Amino acid sequence: NLDSDDDGDLLKDDEEKSSDPATDSLNPDTDGDGFCDGPVTIADVCEAIDAFPTDETEWFDSDGDGIGDNSDPDVDGDGVDNEQDDFPDDPSASKDTDGDGMPDTITGNSTSDPALVEDLDDDNDGLTDIEEDVNGNGTFDDGETNSLDPDTDDDGYCDGNVTIVDVCVAVDAFPLDSSEWLDTDGDGVGNEADTDDDGDNVQDDADQFPKNPDESLDTDGDGIGNNADDDDDNDERKDDNDAFPLD
C-alpha cells in the first residue's frame, strides 16, 4: 500500500502538493520554524499547527486576519494596538487602569486561560465603579468621582478609603474639591475654611489643640491638655489640691 501521507503531518501528499503555496509532503515542517504544516504534533520535530507553513518568520495568527502575530500591530484584533493594549492576546479586554491584572471592562468572551475577570474597582481606590458612576451611564460626569482616577480632584487625598503609594492618601472628605480634604469635626466645612476645626467652640487661632475637641489649653506647655493634665501649671501640686491650678 502506498502511504498517502509520507511525512505524517495529517495532510495528504496530494493536498500538500496542490496547496498554494505548496508544502513539502516529505517534511512535516516545511519552513523549519518548529511548527508543523498539519494539525498534529510530532515529538522532537514540530508542534501543531503552523498558520503560515511556508513562512519561517510566522506561525500564529490569533485574530485570523491573515497577518502573523509576529508582525501584526494588533494581535487580538480588538482595534487597540499591542503597545496600548494591556491584554494584547485577548480581544475581550484592553485596559487595566490600576494594573491589578483585571480588565476595566470585558466585551464578549475572554479567550485567556483562565478567563479574565472584570475589575469592579478600576482605579483601586476602595470605591466600586458603580458607586462612583452615580447615574450609571458609564461616563465620568460632574458631581461624580472618576472611576479611572483614584484622586479625582488631584489634591493628594484618595477618593476612597484606600491609600495608594506614591499617588494619594486616604481618605478625602471632599473628593471633588481640590482645596479641601479634611473635616475633623464633621460639620461639612473643610478644615482649610473652618475657623474651628474640632468644633469645640474655641477658634483655631486661640486653640492649642485645634484638631482635638477635648482640649484647647495647655497652661504649662508640657504637651498635655489641661483637661487631661492633673497638674496644669506644673508646680508639682495636683490640681485638685492646688488653690491656683493655672498659676
Language model: regions and residue ranges:
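Extracellular calcium-associated, cysteine-rich motifs in secreted modular proteins
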Residues: 1-247
